[in-house]
């Protein structure tokens, strides 16, 4: 057992000052120097995967195998940005209307970035903010969830051991009230939050009041649509994985299962069998496939949601043997007969509960998928991938997968629309708010033909040496046209032929 004291306001202010001082030197380091820290952090995670994974399972209860997977994913994200950040943030020559103009869009570090992160993926949520920002030259301060303090401390130690200077990454045992102090501090230049709708509204308002950049990921109620030609066996298997991964405590879990009439009966029968096969128990035991919830309070809240849904007219189908009464377990449950006047119809269920909807056809499936305040992820299952893409285009959400639940990968943009938040993280970070975008222009003096700056653009920006000469020849076309930029509100497509 360990205890962790909250910081005082004075300590918070001192840590911000330390972070700002570190930023002055960290932002001047080369990409190679910053990449060395991220690569070493990735290597440490892999070398001591068991140590880091066991801490996750002990602290928040997830299956040990899934904890190992999270450690691996976190290492991949560190490596991904170490490898790609310099290219992502490379200056971009602008095609201007006048041939006399020589303009370039450059990225400059922002400064101190505040992260406010949840407990369900204790390392992944941190590395998603830390890796791109550290590689961009920013420094990061994070208030992690109060129920994973040891994982929060372990991540800070990881980066220190990897060579990050003191102040480059700071773990904050801060109170909710101190978040206002942090966001109001002029040295804090941006905020990244993953959390509830209410928390997001408060943080966004505070950041907006201070005219600061922010990105928000506020949960979701992802729809999994099974079309008439879907392979039922494969779709049921993916539906169980998509709904029950991480004990069902995942923002991009397949929470709403929408199935067309032609296969609905068969699907529901097989889905019930699949959930009944889950084995509740010790998350360190390899035979366990259903872990406890993160806390008894979370389990109680979810059971109350189920009860309220049934009282409002839904039918609850409990699946499998009764779960243990000792521990924060919740019985895997399918809710059916949900109508729009039932509050559960629009709610997010954070745990092993699936909402099942039967629809007449594709159009109704799309309408139902879009009838939600949320818009984080979603998926379409069909044996016709091209048609699946066309259906996916009609779904109002931030990420859509074909024949696979929403994925978490370093090279796929992560972000939602509607009340699921705004801004994207992961993948190409140029447009994710981690850097300032600055347009630099040089124009020749028409009287002399000489430029009105004393140095040519490559001399002014000596750090542009990685770019080819053709990129910078006036009038030449961009050499990086294959780079994809992801803007807030853009839907990410991810297709698989596995179904």
Describe the residue ranges of each PLM region.
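Rossmann-like NAD(P) dinucleotide-binding subdomain of oxidoreductase/dehydrogenase enzymes
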Residues: 92-234, 359
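Thiamine diphosphate
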Residues: 457, 461-499
